[in-house]
Every structure is written in C-alpha cells, then in structure tokens.
Amino acid sequence: MASLQAYQSHGIRYYRIVESFRKDGKPAIRVLAHLGRVDDILQRHQQDINVPVKILSVSAGAVTALHQLAQDLDVAGRIDRAISTDDEVQVRGSLTVGQSLVAAMIARACAPRSKRAFADWAKTTHLPELMNFSAPKLTSQHFWDQMNALPVDRLAAIEQELVREVIRVEQLQLKALAYDTTNFYTHIASTNSRPKLPQRAHNKQGRHDLRQIGLALVVDQDTQLPLAHALYEGARSDMRTFAEFLKPIRQRLRDLTGQPEQLTIVFDAGASSKQNLEGMANYVTAVRPSNHLALLSEAAGQLAKVPLTTGVTVRAWRGQRMAAGKQREVVVLFSPQLHEGQLRGLQQAVARSVRELEEMGLRPRLSAEAAKRKLEKIRGYQYLRSLLDYKIDTDEQGAVRICVWSDWQEYQRLATRYFGLRVLVTDRAEWTTAQIIEAYRGQSKAEAAFRDLKDPRMFSTRPQFHWTDQKLHVHTFVCVTAYLLVTLLHRRAERKAGFVGSSRRLLEELAGVRCCRLIDRTGRKGRPRVRLQIEEMDPDRRKLAEALGAIPALG
C-alpha cells in the first residue's frame, strides 16, 4: 500500500510517496513519486486548480461591432416603438421583436443562412452573451412569430427614422443619389397563389423558370449607404416601378434633408421615359442611344477631352436638346471599354453568322419559306439586321438559290459613331461636364450594393425561405438594414483605423477577434467557474477592433 513519507536531505524536509514490499523475505520500500518540499506541493496544487477543465472559443469581433452599432442607432428600439401598443411589446425567448430582428440582421451580415440554422451559427459566436438569449430557443418559429408582429406599412417609417439618425450621427451632406432596380429569384411554387409579389419575368440571374421579386434601391453616392428601398412585383417594368417609387421616395428624402434643391437623383436608361422625365427635377439619367442616332453622328466627330476629379481624362461632347418637352443639357460620353466590348460582340456575331451561312450554302435543299426563316434567324443576332441582307430566287426546277451581302458602311458607322457612346440628359445646367459625368458614373454605387446583397457570403437576400408577401417584405428590410450597418461600419473603419479593403474583408478580419470561455476547477463542490478571455491577436487587428468597439467587455 502506498503511503506518504517525510525525509530530510541537507537539512531540508522533503516528501515522497513510497510503497512497502518484501525483498528476499525482508521488508523494503520503493519510491513511487518524489513530491518535493511543502511549498512545491502547494504551488502545484494551486496550478492544477487554475488550469481550465474546458476551453470554448467563439467568434466575437464582428458580432460585437455590429451589435454595438445597432445599439448606438437604437435599431431595436425604433422597431419596438413603431409596433408597440399601450407601451407593450411582444417578447419571445427573452427578446423583443426589434431585438430578434437585430439578431437576424447581424446573422445576415456575418453568415447568411435560414432561420432554422440560426441557432447552430449563434453558438459559435459571442452573440448570445451580448444579447442575453439562449441560442437553441431562437428557432425558425421564433423568427416567424417576431417577423409576423411587424406590419408592412410600418417599414418605411422605421427605415426613414433610422436613416435620419445615420445622417445626423455621420453628419452626411446628401447631394447625388443613385437609383437602380434588380430582381431576386425565389423557389416559391407556381401553385402557391397566396403571395402576389413573386411573378415570372426576365430574371437578371438567368432563372426565367422561377418566380421573382423586384427590389428598388436608393443609395448615397458618396458613402454607398442605402437610404430607401421598395419591394415590388417581379413582373413590373423598371419604368413603371420608377414612376410609382419616385414620388414617395423624393418626399422621404426631402423630409430627411430639408433642402430638396440640393438633391440630384441619378438613374439609368431602364427607368428613362418621356412620362418619367416630364415631372422630374434635379436629375441625371442615361437614355437609349438607339433613339438618338442623329445626335450620336453629330457628336462622335466633336468629342473633347474632359478631365475628372479622379485624375482620369475622358472624351465627351456637350450641347442642348429637347427632352420630354423641355430644353435639357445633353452629354455624349465615349467609353473605350464599352466600345471594345460592343465591337468584339459584333465581330463574334458576324463570325457566327458566316459559319451558319457556309453550312447552309448558296443552294440549300430547303423550300423558299424555310430558307427565309433560317436567314431571318441568322440576321437576328445583335446588330446583324442592319448589316446583312439577302435575296432568295428559285430556278425553273424550283431549286432555291440565295444571295447574301453585307453593308460595310453600316459596319463603319457602328464602329465609329455608335459603339462606346452613352447619351446623358440632365436639368443641372449649372453643373460642369465633369460633374455630370461623375454623377452618372456614381450610379454604379447602387449596382455595387446589389452585388453585395446577392453575395452568398454576406447579406444574401436569396434564398428567402419565406412564402408570404409580409414575410418577404420584412426579410428584405432585414437584409437592407444589415447592409446599412455593415456599410456604415466599413466607413468608420476607413476613417478611424485607415482600413483598406472590402466590407467582406472587414467582417472576415473582425471575425478573427475571438473570445474564449474558460471553465475552471474551483476545488469546491458546485458549478465550475466560467470566465471569458480574449485570444491573442496581431497589433493591426487589435487596432482595428479597438477603433470599432469590436472587443467585448468581459466584466
């Protein structure tokens, strides 16, 4: 049997564990372990208590920064106040409706997924500690109940109040606003007639076989912050959408700024029409070049160099023309990239038509009617209808003979007086040509916002996993507001920490700020002690995290 034995060496008392046994019939001991002095034993005992039994590491930086930003803007409070009745707000799983939607926004920004998968993701983050909820309780039913409590007619007012606060806090001076539309395909069954928003139409992702919803968005050109959005039926045209969206959105923006004459809305040719432009003021738009061939022929030979504030020099022509019954400023802008792409596309179409004509031959074994259909199909490629022409004859035996020729002058006209040219129209006569061009180019900020909203790694408006119009409206509100939070966070990262990179790169960097849950032995009965500790990080990441408030308080 083992026992504890004390012994001395050079006047110092030591302890060891020994075991008795008999050797050759005589009692003896063997040493099992040398324990050292009393101080050594006590120190080792205390170290054993302080060594964690378990270490759990979770991502903390991104969720902490977004949660702090949402708190600063009072996102949850604004939602709750908009839907409260008699100062009572629906609470599920210890969260109000606004708090649940904020959690959904943070999840949408960091790791887009279905509401059913939210709990599994939340367990890997510091979000449950930040918002004081139990992750397993936030099921898809939880989000369904909370989203159902938010009426569609309150969304615009909530968004406006939130944007007003952003403008105040960031001291924004709104000037040029970019407007654009896109669509998102859904997987809502055709037999489901309950929702009216999903409809079949031309889909920009090529999924014409699926029902889609449309999204109109206005962003600030300087900051790319979304200022207003509207969800609409998937089959509605861009022109009709613009006409219906314009009046309420301009009123909202006037209320936000108080100086409507300073606001200029920029939109592309898809929303331009005579009816839309007739009632417009303070705008820059593009119109379809095919409707202004004489103008292009005149301007193509008079393009002048225009230096932009970015240091780039472009070629453009400026004049005045009648647009929607009023005299407007017109700028014809040449884009080398557009010219190169259009010319390459034409050359590919010509090469394809030549191959098909060679396969067809001059004496095809077809009837005259069949030959005509085939030739018309070949001429259907872009621009070929004006370049290629043909004649069909039949001989005495009824055999078909065809003759095909091309219009070289038309080819030259397309290459020199049409390709690469954009026509811009504005009522901002006091602006310089460079200002008009830069305002139009700023319309790409709305397109960039749509790219982010379709990014499967963040925001990802689709797939929606919702099947009613009300849920689709609230889901889109969550996605757009998440985009607002991340864009604002990115703006602050650039300003406060000199961050260089995309919004996705910023979230990835902040996600690397991790928090450890250390479960310690206490040496006593009862629950083990749990403490939080931030993992070590490089100085650049720490600087970024501290600037954005992405390091959680552990007290």
Language model features: what each stretch is:
Residues S3-R16, D24-A28, I83-G555:
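Anion-binding and metal-coordination hotspots
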Residues M1-Q99:
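Conserved glycine(s) in the ABC-transporter nucleotide-binding domain "signature"
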